[in-house]
Amino acid sequence: MIDDQRDMQVDSVNQEENVDSGETKQNTVTEVPRTVLQDVEANIAALMQATKQRDPRLVYRSLRTTSNICHRLNADVLGQLIKKYYSFDNSLKNELLELIDMPQNGDDSSTSITNGNGNTIFPEVDMYLQLLLSMTLYYNEKYEVGAEYIKKVIARLQSYDRRTLDQIAAKLYFYYILFFEKCNRSVECRNTLLSVHRTASLRHDSETQAMVLTLLLRNYIQFNLYDQADRLVSKTSFLTNASNNLAIRYQYYLGRIRAIQLDYTTAHEHLVSAIRKAPNTVYAVQFLEAVYKLHIVVQLLMGEIPERRIFRQKSLEKTLVPYLRISQAVRIGDLCAFTDALSKYEAEFRFDGLYTLICRLRHTVIKTGLRMISLSYSRISLRDVCIKLGLDSEESAEYIVAKGIRDGVIDASIDHSNAFMASNEAMDIYSTEQPQQAFHERIQFCLALHNDSIKSMRYPMDAHKSELEGVEEARRRMDKEMAEADLDDDEPDLGEF
């Protein structure tokens, strides 16, 4: 009996193991990676659901995977999608098939997708497929063909008036400006973008409005039209509910405009905000390179030295070498090293569009060198100052020393008769208001970060109503208990005192 029971237990354990192994095998079989066509079909189904429910969040979920899908697309998949969703219009279908060099089959038996109102395709699905085709043309470097094609797409997009098209339209306008930039025709887009921005503001299309605003600033900065960009910023407002990528681009463009206008403190705040909000992914490396380059120059113009950890980041180490040389020259106040670095990396600085700002650093280098001389020597001749700073004459050294004293760079005096500079005793910085101001700036930043974090949180809909109902229920229950207490006659008579 005992042996039989043991055999039964062993058999039951083996059966359970077989069942578990069968389940794991079944799970491994079901976990099959989806094809590109299935991913596109899933996004299209989500777009159709978003159209019926009028929920823009479903559109956002569909667009999140679009960039990954686009790099996996090929002509066969696009041809299947075009034949399926544009079977109602042979002329449009043939035009789209020509763009991807796909042969046209006359006997196509694909069924068209209707939206239930007599139309043959949802506008959201139509624009999504046009977006996929535009991205494919761009990544295949067919810029001239793509520029002419996307003009027709934009004209077709403007014929629709759907709130659910907001995020797809923003993507289309982004590739619209990219195509024309590659063809050196971005000036042609300016009037179109201005009219689109006005229309988006009237319709309250937040994503399109934010995207077009950043594209206009990009266009103005590309042609050095900083005054027009500043007027555009002053007459418009950036919506807070726009996506994070648009917000950091807007902050970067604002920082660039303010730096050109000599407002380095405001530019520094915008650039720090862009760096902190930027995603730490591979796709954001080039954007971070541009932001860090401008941020380093702005810091140097403010009289600050960038931290060395910025130049030691693996993804930015090679591209920031020219700016490291400039920072080292500014830190030690070596005008000769600064001039050598400026001439050696002039091509890189002009390509980044920062050559003008870096040329302004010459005065900063001279001031830094003058400050170090003042701290090192209690008394030094103007001729030695001229030699150490690499100036042309003693008159130039005397002028620079006098200007440094007037601007508060150094605390010294000039003996014109004997031609020397005498430094005064250094004052304790903790006796001034500078530590208090620095501490105040840090507190302000922490408070602003706390407020932004609270604003970015998502709260459940009508949560306050449930709290009010709970308070009302508690109040009714308390009133009922008080009424029952008044009707209670079981208390003993206290009598007379």
From Swiss-Prot:
Any one GO molecular-function label of the UniProt entry: enzyme regulator activity
Domain PCI, first and last residues per copy: 248-428
One Gene Ontology biological process: ubiquitin-dependent protein catabolic process
Pfam families reported for this sequence: PCI, Rpn3_C
SMART domains for this protein: PAM, PINT
GO CC, alphabetical: nucleus; proteasome regulatory particle, lid subcomplex
Main function: Acts as a regulatory subunit of the 26 proteasome which is involved in the ATP-dependent degradation of ubiquitinated proteins.
PANTHER family xrefs: 26S PROTEASOME NON-ATPASE REGULATORY SUBUNIT 3 (PTHR10758:SF2), 26S PROTEASOME NON-ATPASE REGULATORY SUBUNIT 3/COP9 SIGNALOSOME COMPLEX SUBUNIT 3 (PTHR10758)
Protein name: Probable 26S proteasome regulatory subunit rpn3
Organism: Schizosaccharomyces pombe (strain 972 / ATCC 24843) (Fission yeast)
Encoding gene, per UniProt annotation: rpn3
